[in-house]
Amino acid sequence: MSERTLFDKVWDAHTVRVLPSGQTQLFIGLHLIHEVTSPQAFAMLRERNLPVLFPERTVATVDHIIPTDNRTRPFADPLAEEMIQELERNCRQYRIRFYNSGSGQQGIVHVIAPEQGLTQPGMTIACGDSHTSTHGAFGAIAFGIGTSQVRDVLATQTLALSKLKVRRIEVHGRLGPGVYAKDVILHIIRKLGVKGGVGYAYEYGGSTIEAMSMEERMTLCNMSIEGGARCGYVNPDAVTFEYLKGREFAPQGSDWEEAVAWWQSLASGPDAVYDDVVVFQAAEIAPTVTWGITPGQSIGVDERIPAPEELPESERELAKEAYAYMGLRPGDPIVGTPVDVCFIGSCTNGRLSDLREAAKIAKGQRVAPGVKAFVVPGSERVKQEAEREGLREIFEAAGFEWRDPGCSMCLAMNPDRLVGRQISASSSNRNFKGRQGSPSGRTLLMSPAMVAAAAVSGKVVDVRELL
């Protein structure tokens, strides 16, 4: 039916039944777990003497709390050691596939599943992590869930969910030099707001999106949640299929052609009906930097921090709170803002293409005096490939630290933290108060290339000047 969206097709294909509450009981094709949100869920199973219904549909790794510098066991942080031991025990007991540190497959959960071909078009995917929307880049419907829902998926392989509206977001045209997928999604969030997507799934399309690589599409879908959406996705196409072909868990042989035919049928029809359509032009998007305490408080690198009267009335009080917390003044340019720490990594921007772009800026440069800069590959596989390409040497020669894979400073559940009033240039996804470990630490979100430019300059600069 040409009027159906991909979201409708995937939702209907996975509907078990409509519950008396009006919610849908949805079958979950792939469940991803990690060390932080799973221990309590397994404990709840044991309390009820329940098995994991489909252990073959669950995949585990360690990412949130694991250190990125010293992995000698036991870990220096006893809580990290305890939580990882618990995940190891649970995976053994319930026979769940587990990618531990040193396996060659460990990494941030939203990096390892796509790179192994576990994430595929038409799937429903759940994980106890907000940024599960990343997997929508493949034409999957992927939800971040809480611990009690992790329990539900382990026990029943289903979730009770309310069906979402669908907003199509189109971006047309060619991105300029120094403008990346990170800038596109920050621009979208700035324009639609951090609550603009509440109750929606975002479908991304248009010539700009179609021209993006899979890793760029993952960055885009990753931050759908920062825009208030429950999930985000891109219709699968030749770019998707080329990425998946030959990967470990992708269909093989004659099954491949059959899978591609089905995946192609999932794309939203030419007459698909949407609840809303929003259109952006790529030419209007510049390298973007957040200046405040939400991902929606951002500006182009060549702009000045807005005054309250320039903002919608509903945003003015939060803006005043942001000025005070960040120590920035309305009317000041964001260029020239000094930085103390520069972090390249996270499930948003810790993939190989991200490191390549940052390395182009770092090559032949030196990290500015007084700045701590470090690179955290998104997975052991990314790290190995980056080292084969010589990226590690480029970063280390420039004075960046080269780390092991993990979530690192994105959320600071591990030793990678800001101290005091330090301000970071970060390729991660959230700039909330205290997000990076210090209750008074400050975060400026930007692309990996912009972070590298800030690291070698000691301040926010326009990356286009270094290209």
From Swiss-Prot:
[4Fe-4S] cluster binds at residues 347, 407, 410. The keyword Lyase applies. Pfam families: Aconitase (PF00330). The lineage of its organism: Bacteria, Bacillati, Cyanobacteriota, Cyanophyceae, Synechococcales. The gene is leuC. SUPFAM superfamilies: Aconitase iron-sulfur domain (SSF53732). Heterodimer of LeuC and LeuD. Belongs to the aconitase/IPM isomerase family. LeuC type 1 subfamily. GO terms for biological process: L-leucine biosynthetic process. Its cofactor is [4Fe-4S] cluster. It catalyses: (2R,3S)-3-isopropylmalate = (2S)-2-isopropylmalate. Its EC number is 4.2.1.33. This is 3-isopropylmalate dehydratase large subunit. Keywords: 4Fe-4S, Amino-acid biosynthesis, Branched-chain amino acid biosynthesis, Iron, Iron-sulfur, Leucine biosynthesis, Lyase, Metal-binding. Binds 1 [4Fe-4S] cluster per subunit.
